[in-house]
Amino acid sequence: LKIKEVSAIVTGGASGLGLATAREFLERGASVSIFDLENSNTASLVAKLNEDFEGKVIVANVDVTDSNSVTKALGVVNRRFGKINVLVNCAGVAIAKKTTGKEGAHPLDLYQKVIDVNLVGTFNMVRLSAIEMEKNKPNDSGERGCIINTASVAAFDGQKGQAAYSASKGGVAASTLPLARDLASSNIRVNTIAPGLFLTPMLEGLPEEAKEDLAKQVVFPKRLGSPTEFAKLASFMIQSEYLNGETVRLDGAIRLP
């Protein structure tokens, strides 16, 4: 797929990795629909993006775990841009909680929330977006769509307090190949990015000393990843037609003990 011909949906696109990805696509000529929950920054984000990329962007209030919410938003995208041929799933939550602690056992509802948003929400977006992609006329290479999910190095090297998060991201990574096989008959590719330590809003709030300590754990380059690097890999995955069913670690070779 050529980026300038893409109508992409980016979940979690109002901040962090998702926002960087949305901007990367917009700057390269794509039409982008950002699906995210409304927050205090949404109004200013909409104004800024419309100022920079008038007519090329939609920002929709969407809960990825709610099928009705997703279906309604997909209809808006189709009416505005006429097609959906790329989905990048960045929506997610990261909640750290040990299995047992001074307060007792890990709350089950908290575990279920992480699984619901990160894993079930990802699959919900995939299944409903794929139905729309199947309606597309194949391009010259026969392709109808491209889906990129977001896992994490925690899928492979989970740390203390990450039982729920690692399970959710491990599920995303494990589903990559079967999803690619399921959708191959529809000429839709599926890949996953597993980012390491990235300078997202979650880490930006840490003291500089803490960020430096985290960066030292990276093999090379010894720094936190930039969201633009995630965005560029997503862009590459869209254009690389032979890349399918793969989970790519984007982590500076970090392997956490």
Language-model segments: residues:
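Conserved mid-core segment of classical short-chain dehydrogenase/reductases
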Residues: 71, 94-112, 131, 135-141, ...
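Canonical Rossmann dinucleotide-binding motif of NAD(H)/NADP(H)-dependent dehydrogenases/reductases
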Residues: 2-33
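Catalytic Tyr-X3-Lys loop
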Residues: 93, 104-124, 147-148, 165, ...
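Residue(s) in the substrate-gating loop at a strand-loop-helix junction
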Residues: 152
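Catalytic Tyr-x(3-8)-Lys segment
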Residues: 116, 209-229
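Alpha-helical segment proximal to the catalytic Tyr-Lys
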Residues: 131, 180-182
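Short, small/polar-rich loop/turn modules that mediate ligand/substrate recognition or access, typified
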Residues: 184, 189, 243-246
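C-terminal substrate-recognition "lid" of short-chain dehydrogenase/reductases
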Residues: 226-250, 255
